[in-house]
């Protein structure tokens, strides 16, 4: 399934992701990885310029290990890099960005930024080395996509995170944690926002 198919099938605006060929896109899932019904998996299948950063242990995440994999993935890219992160993947990005060489990073698209300081340890999850959440300006452009009924972060907290990171906060409405349970499929609206984000990187008008 290519970009053109997605545009026709879902009637998405013309700016969807037509400039994606200028970038390497790294997909960063959260705790337990993104399954077959997750929008990240759909995107990875649909676009050849997107690839997932695979972690050795998805169930007991260790920041040092995840950061090492991310650094290696970025080093292997030939084009400017876009990071597409979900949930714990957003905490990986914000911490990694403060210590890594980020010159290759063109921007980050951060979906469902988990409030790890409040939720670490719940449901049996442990995030070794990810907390506390880093609330410093990111050295690259970023958008935060936040849901108003995300069980892992209050909307106002997500908006405060975006402000601390120097990122734009996009109100996604009532989509829960925006994972597999939200049943977003290929998530056409998410692709629209991602396309607008890419357009904004080039200083273009991002209105559909």
Task: Label the predicted regions.
Residues 19-79, 203:
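Active-site catalytic motif of lipid deacylating hydrolases and related acyltransferases
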Residues 95-106:
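Conserved hydrolase catalytic core segment
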Residues 180-194:
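Post-His helix in hydrolase/transferase enzymes
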Residues 84-93:
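Gly/Ala-rich beta-loop-alpha elbow adjacent to hydrolase catalytic centers
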Residues 30, 55-58, 109-118:
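Active-site nucleophile loop of the alpha/beta-hydrolase fold
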Residues 138, 144-146, 150:
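Short beta-strand/loop motif that positions the catalytic acidic residue
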Residues 151-157:
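Conserved alpha/beta-hydrolase "acid-adjacent" motif
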């Amino acid at each position: 399934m290519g970009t053109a198919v997605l545009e026709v099938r879902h009637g998405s605006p013309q700016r969807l992701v037509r400039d994606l060929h200028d970038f390497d896109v790294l997909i960063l899932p959260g705790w337990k990885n993104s399954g077959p019904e997750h929008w990240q998996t759909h995107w990875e299948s649909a676009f050849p310029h997107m690839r997932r950063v695979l972690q050795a242990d998805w169930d007991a995440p260790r920041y040092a290990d995840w950061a090492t994999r991310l650094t290696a993935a970025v080093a292997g890219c030939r084009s400017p890099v876009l990071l597409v992160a979900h949930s714990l993947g957003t905490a990986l990005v914000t911490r990694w960005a403060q210590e890594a060489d980020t010159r290759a990073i063109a921007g980050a698209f951060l979906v469902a930024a988990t409030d790890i300081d409040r939720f670490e340890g719940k449901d049996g999850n442990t995030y070794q080395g990810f907390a506390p959440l880093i609330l410093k300006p990111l050295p690259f452009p970023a958008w935060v996509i936040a849901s108003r009924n995300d069980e892992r972060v209050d909307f106002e907290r997500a908006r405060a995170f975006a402000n601390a990171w120097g990122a734009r906060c996009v109100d996604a409405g009532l989509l829960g944690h925006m994972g597999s349970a939200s049943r977003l499929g290929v998530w056409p609206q998410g692709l629209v926002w991602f396309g607008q984000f890419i357009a904004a990187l080039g200083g273009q008008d991002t209105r559909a």
